[in-house]
Regions:
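Extended, compositionally biased repeat/scaffold regions that form elongated interaction surfaces
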Residues: 1-334
Length: 334
């Protein structure tokens, strides 16, 4: 440096900053250095100015920023002094590519890009997620996650969504993002029935209610259930997770209204209503002579009754006739 001249007179200023800002930053650097000498005996967390940005970065946030590489990190230059958060406990400093947040419970962590957008949807630190407790962490298949006090945010294919609580526990039990469900494709959402909650995933859904707990449905079965209105439709909530059938190939799930959905490759997923399901059960379900359902239920016109329904199966059909207090059924094998 040349005595009597400012650093900006001798050194090129990085793009985006004015000479006025650079000179202010140099003056602040000198002031911070002077304060540090005066306070050395007090062990007070110090601050640092990163020329040419005229802002102080302090304490644990400064330490995290330096750990990441300071202005050479993905955050680039500071854009604010340290700020107090609305809760009166946490702190934050903003940078060109995102903020670093600090809390007594979680420490200091950057929250940027899609993670910041997902956190914002949940109300930042005042929402159910609370403060960050980790930096971003690499996950399976090129994804990333970041942990917060109340949940995790997972990023994959340029989308990030929050998942927590009992739904996350169920997801973890089947392998999380490396399992058959893949990554979340929504935040945790409200279900109208029983104050439920759910997350959609790349290959299915987990839905929770206080009455049923967390239940898992995969793609085709989930989609058929959705065609009947999901939990608010006639089928209601799933009574259990989707299960692998006895043959090891097909799948099925049972629902509140007494119906079930059966899935088999090529055939697809079909709902079996309670009336037909009762007859289907008498013949051994999918392991019996009828095999898997292949069609939706249709009304059947018969002389005996106007309330008949029929459904096709791999090896025949079942026709159910409602006679009020009693019922008849007819079967046909192919």
């Amino acid at each position: 440096m040349v005595p009597g001249r400012m650093r900006s007179d001798c050194q090129q200023i990085p793009g985006g900053f004015t000479k006025e800002q650079a000179d202010k930053a140099e003056t602040m650097e000198a002031a911070v250095a002077g304060r540090a000498q005066q306070r050395a005996a007090l062990a007070t967390p110090g601050c640092q100015v990163y020329w040419p940005a005229p802002y102080e970065v302090c304490g644990a946030i400064r330490d995290k920023y330096n750990e990441l590489g300071g202005p050479n990190s993905f955050l680039l230059w500071p854009t604010s002094n340290e700020l107090s958060n609305p809760d009166g406990f946490g702190k934050r400093s903003t940078f060109q590519n995102g903020p670093i947040y600090w809390s007594p419970a979680g420490g200091a962590h950057p929250v940027v890009n899609h993670f910041f957008a997902a956190w914002q949807r949940q109300g930042w630190e005042s929402g159910p997620l609370g403060y960050p407790t980790t930096d971003e962490i690499p996950t399976a298949n090129g994804g990333r996650r970041q942990e917060f006090q109340g949940a995790g945010i997972y990023w994959h294919l340029n989308e990030a969504y929050a998942i927590g609580g009992a739904i996350r526990d169920k997801w973890n039990s089947v392998g999380a993002e490396g399992g058959p469900l893949g990554y979340p494709t929504t935040d945790e959402l409200s279900a109208k029935k029983n104050n439920g909650r759910y997350n959609n995933f790349e290959n299915g859904t987990i839905i929770w209610s206080g009455q049923t707990g967390s239940r898992l449905l995969f793609g085709a079965v989930r989609d058929r259930w959705a065609s009947f209105g999901r939990e608010d439709g006639e089928m209601g909530l799933p009574l259990g997770d989707e299960q692998v059938a006895a043959d090891g190939t097909g799948h099925f799930a049972n629902f509140e209204d007494g119906s079930a959905i059966y899935w088999y490759p090529v055939i697809g997923a079909w709902r079996v209503p309670p009336s037909v399901l009762a007859v289907f059960a008498q013949f051994g379900f999918e392991s019996g002579k009828f095999g898997y359902p292949t069609t939706a239920v249709e009304a059947v016109s018969l002389p005996q009754s106007s309330n008949g329904v029929g459904q096709g199966f791999q090896n025949g059909s079942i026709i159910y006739i409602d006679r009020g207090e009693t019922y008849d059924y007819y079967t046909a094998s192919y």
